[in-house]
Amino acid sequence: MNCLYQTKRISDLKEKMLSSKRYASIAQARIITRVYQENDKLSIPKKRALSLKAALEELEISVEDEELIVGNRTKGIRYGVVFPESGCSWINQEFETLPTRPQDQFLVKEEDIKEFREKIYPYWKGKSLEDAIKGTYGIEINEISKVVKINQKDHAQGHICPDSALWLKLGPQGLMEKAKKKLKNCKDEQKEFYECTILVLEGAVHFMQRYHDLIESEKIESLKEVGKICMKLSKRPPETFHEAVQSLWFLFVILHMESNASSFSPGRMDQYLYPYYQRDIEKDSLTKQEALEILECLWLKFNQVVYLRNQNSAKYFAGFPIGFNIAIGGVDEKGNDTYNDLSLLCLKAQEHLGLPQPNLSVRLNKNSSHELMQAAIKVVSLGSGMPQFFNDEAIIQPMIEDLGIEEKDARNYAIVGCVELTTHGNNLGWSDAAMFNFNKVLELTLNHGRCLLTNQQIGLDLGSLETYETYQDLENAFQKQIDYFIDKMMAAEKIVEKAHQDYLPTAFLSTVIDDCLEKGLDVTKGGAKYNLSGIQMIQVANLVDSLAAIKQLVYDDKMISQHDLLNALQEDFKGYEIMQTMLLNKVPKYGNDVKWVDELGNQWACYFREKMKRYTNYRGGPYHTGMYTVSAHVPMGENVGASPDGRNALKPLADGGMSPVYGRDLQGPTAVLKSVSKLNNSCTTNGGLLNMKFLPEFFKTETGCLKFENFLRAFVDLKVPHIQFNVVRKEDLLDAKVHPENHQSLTIRVAGYTAYFVELAGKLQDEIIERTTYENI
């Protein structure tokens, strides 16, 4: 693989993409609105299907000279799509501020704002997903917003791994034939579902043909072969590697056009694309260099899709994370380690391009090869924040035992979005359902249920730190407060999921999720084989450090009185600086392999997980839990007053999810692994995230790379589910903040995703800069 290179074609296409400006586009919103108006008396599923079909047949499309893979959901590169079905109120309020907001800016056109206000918004006012949720439960959701962030209130869910192998096997025509056969013999209540799937698949066929027609009409010689591929794919499944990759990209473009959601993930691409690659290699119709160039064109396409979020959500999901997660390596259905040339070519593509998308993941296990690990380490050393690593030894068994996933499906797990775990092609995992702020709940428990920042009564008044005579009394009150907010969160979640069923059925997605066509049931209504929902715990590290400080300094050693600590928290440590220093330095912290401290983390993660087992989601499936933050540790920290771990009010919480608080992991990276290994992996079946930062110099020698491989093998042996790395100097980040024009291509691992550092808001940049940096293992 070392002889492979990046071609001029790829360099030119990359440069053009990176120089493209981001705009908010209303083109699809215009079509959707017209179709809904023309078919006002039809059901929402039928209107959704007709509007997607119309968009596929009418949206203006474009191609770039020299592309090997074509297709996009807008004419422009990196345009964010206004999607009225999911929510219009926020865009109506924020349209003018999109170019200047603190995070994730988009340019806007005055004529688009005018058309939106005069023609689109008036129709959708009161009719969208956002309006339905606000009208039903909006007040209650707002009341708990400092503790719980309910997601998917104004956009589609996404966070799913379609059955790409099925799509490649049948293509849209084959899936349409299957749906038509089902329609002939279906029950009355299934009829509309099959009619909708046929409509959207007809649209998919036309969409592919339109790219052929465009290339022919514009006589673009460099794309003539690509045009033929597009026409062929509209009629039958792919046969060659190039055809398979083009078909795969069409699948994901259409999924985004249907739902405008993040985290539709290709999954184990090196496994299901390998037969096409191998066949072409054996026939001498494809070289490794040609295959790499095709993959790199696909990589560029992944980076052309950006997601338009409201201003508040942009804080929680900063840097345009779109979540095309590709997982390479790992075991097969029989438990054997499997990696191949495509695994290595995916790593080579990331090595060459260093772009934020796709979110490249490597699955490791006890038998992972030296070749794969060293190829991955080489890419890590370049500092793009990729790949991240997942541990089969930690992940598969809890999926089987805790969630009831069949062994073959668990072994074939994929990752969606950042670090969320899913089965491949048969699960609506709803993995980004909500985020639960442990630290705000503790704050309320210590202060009569009142917010330290506003004195507002938010939680139950169970007493205060002054009234809890023992540490056990505090724990009992904390449990009750957690239970109270879990109940509130679950009530809100049921409302949100029901609204998605009613307002955003997804006929096209349902054709590529196993069991939906068989059942005649949309995926939002429970058509998938597995129906999970995932809740994130935010942030265990701060919680552990706070409880450890209270336990040791207040109740055990009595070095600080209950009264004084509560006063210090209420005053944000003003006048209590000596106490703050004690809280920071006199108590061992999570991440240093101190057993009693680390076990506090496991205690509360398990408590939360067990409570979640009491609930089922609106599709009849179980809730499960994860530990990852995306970028929510910054805005969620802004909701929390001063905390007993010595943290000042409004400051960010720990990054990641399983990561220690930055600057407090003093015993090195191996100690961090040992601390994290004490967390029960049944608590992270929805995904867990461990961030680490190393200096680039560590990887300059062969010895350093071998030591890093041994560190990764220790990660596997300790059964830690996830780890990822930033490889960067603090000085470079500081310079990038001051001189962003000199660091436009600097990518950084934020949480479970990579973003351009200079595109992040200042507070998030500061948090990343201050993360612990390791010089050695």
What residues fall within each predicted segment?
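Conserved catalytic cores of very large enzyme subunits
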Residues: 1-197, 221, 225, 229-232, ...
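Low-complexity, highly charged intrinsically disordered N-terminal segments
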Residues: 197, 204, 208-211, 215
